[in-house]
Amino acid sequence: MAVEILNESGIEVPEDALLRMARHVYARLHVHERAETAVTVVDAARMAELHEEWMDLPGPTDVMSLPMDELTPGSPEAPAEGVLGDVVLCPEVAAEQAARGGHSRDDELLLLLTHGMLHLLGYDHVEDAEREEMFTLQDRLVSEVLGRPAPAPTVED
């Protein structure tokens, strides 16, 4: 599975763990082995620029999903193929959220990456039922990689 981690933040992040998490999401949701995504890690200033440009919202955010192809989870018999798109992470915002949530910044980054990838696959949390489905799946996927319960999400929708 083609997952590229691009750290443009100048801040050390757990690239191996991010790669492992992304591949796990692909595998569990039956995304084709030739599907592609990029995970870009940026500083707060760059994230604020992207947030304004793509969402027309001020200030940095924790994670942004920038979809390319419209992919949905596949099945073992028919995995989804294509370019998922990009997930952009901000370790500075992740660190603030992790501190509020009482867990590590690295765990928060895994949670945010999973959240962003689920958005790329068409999951959302606007409606209560969607939120329950997405956050339950997010929790399960992160827990499977961590080998322990995932931290509770610390973001506000």
Swiss-Prot record:
GO terms for molecular function: metalloendopeptidase activity; RNA endonuclease activity; zinc ion binding. It comes from the Bacteria. Zn(2+) binds at H115, H119, H125. Keywords: Cytoplasm, Endonuclease, Hydrolase, Metal-binding, Nuclease, Ribosome biogenesis, rRNA processing, Zinc. GO terms for cellular component: cytoplasm. GO terms for biological process: rRNA processing. Gene3D superfamilies: Metalloproteases ('zincins'), catalytic domain. SUPFAM superfamilies: Metalloproteases ('zincins'), catalytic domain. Binds 1 zinc ion. This is Endoribonuclease YbeY. It comes from Micrococcus luteus (strain ATCC 4698 / DSM 20030 / JCM 1464 / CCM 169 / CCUG 5858 / IAM 1056 / NBRC 3333 / NCIMB 9278 / NCTC 2665 / VKM Ac-2230) (Micrococcus lysodeikticus).
